[in-house]
Amino acid sequence: MLLIEWNKKFNLTGITEIRDIYIKHFGDSLMLYKGIDGTKSLIDVGTGAGFPGIPLKIAGYKNKVVLLEANGKKASFLEHVTDTLGLEQIFICQDRAEIAGREDIYRERFDVSTARAVAPLNVLVEYCAPFIKKDGLFIAMKTDKTELESAKNAMKQLFLEVYKIESQTIPFSDIKRCNIYFKKIKNILDKYPRADGIPKKKPL
């Protein structure tokens, strides 16, 4: 498996056993497949080793998928694996969310944004909301919904409201997951996202 080979050199993921990779990475990612319209454009923010973006593409996601990853080694892995697998309509952007979210080619251009093991929810909201269009969806992949309370102000500032919450168990495991879907009710203010590093240092 490419992920295991590259992980030995570049530490792409802390999950190293092949069964755990299939369950905790692929199984977790694919639980989104039924919840997203595959004809919608998608950006996977802080994708790391390509989760959930690459499994969604392998499963047949039809529209454009952009994998956003700031780490150069991880971005190189993503280029290699997408080329090796011959995946179409999938693109790699090596950049910080706070920077890419201000670029015209990415800002409010997507129907869906996803984020997995990236940051606390009140930070993720500022990372991900700038990429989605009005009426678009941001999906936060979490273990539970306890972070919603601390994210209320960020949601208000970025014009997001909870659309639905899906609590599931990853197949072939007892691992609980909670996918929180947010809908963007209007376009965000020009001041968001704030400068590189600020959302993490001073969450809304």
Q: What are these model-predicted stretches?
A:
Residues K152-L204:
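SAM/dcSAM-binding transferase cores
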Residues G101-V112:
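A short acidic, Gly/Pro-enriched loop at the edge of an enzyme's catalytic core
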Residues A49-K62, E126-A129:
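Conserved SAM-binding loop of SAM-dependent methyltransferases across substrates and taxa
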Residues M1-T39, I43, K73-I90, A195:
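Class I SAM-dependent transferase core
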Residues N122-L137:
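A short glycine-rich, Lys/Arg-flanked "PGG" loop and its adjoining helix->strand segment in the class I
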Residues Q94-G101:
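Conserved SAM/SAH-binding loop
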Residues D135-K145:
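Conserved beta-strand signature within the Rossmann-like core of class I S-adenosyl-L-methionine
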Residues K64-E69, A140:
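Conserved SAM-binding motif I beta-strand of class I
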